[in-house]
Amino acid sequence: MTMITDSLAVVLQRRDWENPGVTQLNRLAAHPHFASWRNSEEARTDRPSQQLRSLNGEWRFAWFPAPEAVPESWLDCDLPDADTVVVPSNWQMHGYDAPIYTNVTYPITVNPPFVPAENPTGCYSLTFNIDECWLQKGQTRIIFDGVNSAFHLWCNGRWVGYGQDSRLPSEFDLSAFLRAGKNRLAVMVLRWSDGSYLEDQDMWRMSGIFRDVSLLHKPTTQISDFHVATRFNDDFSRAVLEAEVQMCGELRDELRVTVSLWQGETQVASGTTPFGGEIIDERGGYADRVTLRLNVENPALWSAEIPNLYRAVVELHTADGTLIEAEACDVGFREVRIENGLLLLNGKPVLIRGVNRHEHHPLHGQVMDEQTMVQDILLMKQNNFNAVRCSHYPNHPLWYTLCDRYGLYVVDEANIETHGMVPMNRLTDDPRWLPAMSERVTRMVQRDRNHPSVIIWSLGNESGHGANHDALYRWIKSVDPSRPVQYEGGGADTTATDIICPMYARVDEDQPFPAVPKWSIKKWLSLPGELRPLILCEYAHAMGNSLGGFAKYWQAFRQYPRLQGGFVWDWVDQSLIKYDENGNPWSAYGGDFGDTPNDRQFCMNGLVFADRTPHPALTEAKHQQQFFQFRLSGRTIEVTSEYLFRHSDNELLHWSVALDGKPLASGEMPLDVAPQDKQLIELPELPQPESTGQLWLTVHVVQPNATAWSEAGHISAWQQWRLAENLSVALPSAPHAIPQLTTSEMDFCIELGNKRWQFNRQSGFLSQMWIGDEKQLLTPLRDQFIRAPLDNDIGVSEATRIDPNAWVERWKAAGHYQAEVALLQCTADILADAVLITTAHAWQHQGKTLFISRKTYRIDGSGQMAITVDVEVASDTPHPARIGLTCQLAQVAERVNWLGLGPQENYPDRLTAACFDRWDLPLSDMYTPYVFPSENGLRCGTRELNYGPHQWRGDFQFNISRYSQQQLMETSHRHLLHAEEGTWLNIDGFHMGIGGDDSWSPSVSAEFQLSAGRYHYQLVWCQK
């Protein structure tokens, strides 16, 4: 044990937090979760241990701008003005200094290993009583599961130790410091340390004791470590459980270890052995270690699909059988290996349906509770995810247990990121930083290696490629050859990774960056000598209204076996709750706390909002990742299962046929598909519709029974096909009254019964409509070529740093947002049975014509207004965001009814999950509340839209809400939006895709850009 004076002054003088060679003082070695049961049955059933005591709760807290401001007296007694905070928590969430959101740029001046003199410091203290029997014998430890960034610990005024690495436990022996009765802990937490240079992840920078604190009482002679691993024969019919157990203490020669393996209430295998029997080399063996091997016949294998778990109980006892201590862990029999360029799980090539997940809570910052963790896992499973990357640090210990039990594959990632360094490997190639990096990798492995869910180790994130990575890669491969190692830094295919693991590589497009080219994922596989599998560590940047082009990745994954999936960036928006002057909550992002530097809304890249409400993009991910694929041939549906191990034992296939949303026939049958097999389902003779319309066959896979992660009735997969339809010929209708045209100097006015249409001759726009005396429009019907910019449209562009390549900057520079309209034509003609208004407009900026729009409005005797639009786009203007019409309707109706794709928001490059049907939703549900307002709520493939007294028919896309595109463009946060008068309607003949390969470069694929020179669309507007 390192001895140091208890004086605070000496601690401050040492400045351990500015020395990369000092990562800890007196911290105990890393190990798996301990509970120190004194009863084997309690260990087997994972009951709460009497030897484990939580110290979570209210602690005294005082904040100081720097450690030098902390008074020496605080070591012995609470300060009179100390506050109370809950542990675990981030002190920024309690009003002490501010959270900082930055992606790449360090939040402090870069001068490693030194940190600013103004280093916010939190002083925590807790007074507690200790169980006196704990003082009489044994060892009492204190465990801090997570403290950011570094801390010194005192107990009863005496210095205990020091720790850093905010995402792994720091554990200390308190035995020599405790006394009978009351005891006082004092923890001085520093916001910044040299460790902060290794923790430059894209997240909020927060501080404090943000994970659990607990006391653990162990016997003097104790289990100090244990490691389990599973080995198999070729066909997985026989397995061996290897358990390596290490002890410390006395009576070594008289001790025995028993390892028993349980499956529920049944003991499967057991073995007992003394210590020191295994020869390691010519000098002998470890006197304090032993390895037991238990044979298991026909083991129930673990996978994310079927997470079969056993329970291993490790008992330390005397030769006569007296139990000293028991530890235990869940065991999953599974094998991970790479063979012939494929990542195999239990001999099968696994397709990673993955997502990156930050530990984030909108109210609690980086504090994770079990309820939130379970909620995340259930949502992931329900949306067909099978894997999660712990981005970019080891997670709360409970997370891994839950992943074991519910079934998720885990990439466990070391808490190392130096993204803001120039070059990025400045520290990771420096041997002076190897000890700090080594602690972060080795301790992660030692803590988490018993978890079957952990199938891949990661050396960290965005830290370049340095010699330290190579050393740590070799260490892991030596200590744990049972798992592959991945690391993206330095080009995603260095010697420090077993898997090609690029981020944001595109399907077909090379990005030939200097030094670290990012090849298309298809090309990467074919590079000379490249035999590794490719799994994208990050892809499909889900920032705001995004995930366009996701289907293209999944087409490639299914086409090329060595393209084994990837991890979407990312799971949850990292917005935080603030409150306005009236106490109303609102969602904040970078800069909203006065934090500098900041990267604005770049913290919100989630498939779910911070409160775990799904984004519409989540449904697209669910559909593309579904485990059942379908093919229709005649009346036969071929169902292919992509499950590797699971037979479809809880699935019904429901099919239905509908004509323009009207059900014609349906049926249901059980699915009986073996893993990686097919089932042919013959449908009955389908009804022939008597009328015309779109005829669709829809299939859903429904789980009739509840599972551990879903309720009864959960839909896991679906598909639609458009069937052959009857052709129709428009027959002449019975004569109607002929609309009457009235011409004045200002207007053309058409009247039919109680309806009137007014066209302003000076503007050429439909300026008003009446039903009776009620006006229908608040603004004229106009062309629209813009959208409120998406995050993907903005990219990295900002007011002080313009990116001219961003879509929004191209549109601005070309004048799309500032275009003024010039009337070219506005005429009226009386036809035999209708009135025809013909208009032409030029949309211009600084004397240059960007668009010419020619329209005809044909109002017939039935009251229908048929609108035909032809648009010419200048060849040298950027491709527009949309080609459509917009107006502000006077009515605010409660519901919107449409025949088209839905029910969720969908866009041309993100619509495979949408289904064609007749949908009916509240108006409020047509708006997607992205925290940073943008274009939202589009519904594509629409044949009919009904709202209030109005109906629109044609083939178009639309969005409808209380917010104009102008307001969405000008508003920084969703809570600042105000419902405008009436309802804004946008009807598009054509709409550009949204992109999503990344959010900092134009990523809309060419096929989803509006690159043609001419566009034509039609629609009919009438009153119901």
Swiss-Prot record:
Disulfide bonds: none
Residues noted as binding Mg(2+) 2 in the record, renumbered to the chain: 598
Alphabetical GO biological process terms: lactose catabolic process
Binding site for substrate: 103, 202, 462, 538-541, 605, 1000
Record's protein name: Beta-galactosidase
UniProt-listed Enzyme Commission number(s): 3.2.1.23
Top-level EC class as recorded in UniProt: hydrolase
Keyword Lipid metabolism: no
Chain ranges passing through the membrane: none
Binding partners and assembly: Homotetramer.
